[in-house]
Amino acid sequence: MQKNTASEFMMTFVQEYLDGKRSRLDFDLDFSHYLMKHYAKMDRENPDLTECFNFYLAEEGFDQAEGLSDDRHRKLIQKQFNKFKAALRDGFF
């Protein structure tokens, strides 16, 4: 993946949350905003990668996290991020 891409921005955003550099409130408020803002550019850069990110992090992560405790929220996002990164490692993109 090229450096300084919209996809890289979104991956860094998620990783900062998982590393404790962003609060859950910040993550919850900003995730959808940033995804909408960067989605078109991500899709131009790599449509398959964008669809994978959207599936694992938005649909199966963020959208399923409502009502979870902070700890369970972070664990769910970590699990989904790991699945996304595994798809990257397996060379699907």
Model-derived segments and spans:
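Acidic, Ser/Pro/Thr-rich low-complexity regulatory regions
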Residues: M1-F93
